[in-house]
Design a protein with these regions (language model features):
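Glycine-rich portal/gate segments that line the openings of hydrophobic small-molecule binding cavities
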Residues: 41-88, 107, 143-157
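Hydrophobic ligand-binding cavity/cleft-lining segments
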Residues: 1-51
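Short strand-connecting beta-turns/loops that link adjacent beta-strands
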Residues: 16, 77-78, 102-105
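Beta-strand/loop substructures that line and gate deep hydrophobic ligand-binding cavities in soluble
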Residues: 85-136, 156-157
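Short, surface-exposed coil-to-beta transition loops
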Residues: 6-8, 65-69, 92-95
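Generic structural detector for well-ordered beta-strands
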Residues: 10-14, 58, 71-73, 98-100, ...
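Hydrophobic pocket/interface hotspot
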Residues: 20-24, 30, 55, 72, ...
Length: 157
């Protein structure tokens, strides 16, 4: 059984679980929330997400082109979306998007289970760099997602 690392981060969003789920089930929205260091060049997918459905991404991370083929492993409307990778820069990748209805909106939790290739070098990078990379990426993604769902009330509404 492969060993993997886990990264997890949550954010409170001013939206219903149905709204947040609908946004995340469309992989084309990744370009709306990706940090500048991750440029989305191409997205091929079918919407809505269904278990077993595939999507393909071409991204550029720090100037390096990366091809990604993902598959929706689970698609539970308004509850969770789980994607795995058939082709990616990772040896193992499983990303769960969990949506919980809470006072004030939706608590969305991103949980990433991953392992890097390159043997000992990959394990060293994981211990020294990956937490920083994931933290920076998900801070940026969650900030952009909060801004996307921010609902400012006008006077008199």
């Amino acid at each position: 059984m492969p060993r993997f690392s886990v990264f997890e981060r949550s954010v409170l969003l001013d939206a219903t679980p149905a709204e947040v789920y609908a946004f995340h089930e469309d992989p084309r929205n990744i370009s709306k929330i990706s940090p500048p260091s991750l440029r989305v060049e191409r997205v091929e997918c079918s919407v809505p997400a269904t278990a077993g459905g595939e999507f393909r991404l071409r991204v550029s991370q720090f100037g390096l082109p990366l091809e990604w083929t993902g598959v929706w492993e689970e698609a539970v409307p308004h509850g969770r979306l789980v994607d795995g990778a058939r082709k990616s820069p990772f040896r193992h990748w499983r990303h769960s998007h969990l949506f919980a209805d809470v006072p004030g909106g939706t608590l969305m939790t991103d949980r990433v289970e991953y392992s890097l290739p390159l043997g000992l070098l990959g394990r060293l990078l994981d211990k020294t760099v990956m937490k920083l990379v994931f933290t920076a990426m998900f801070i940026a993604r969650h900030k952009a997602t909060r801004q996307f769902f921010f609902k400012e009330k006008l006077p008199g509404e």
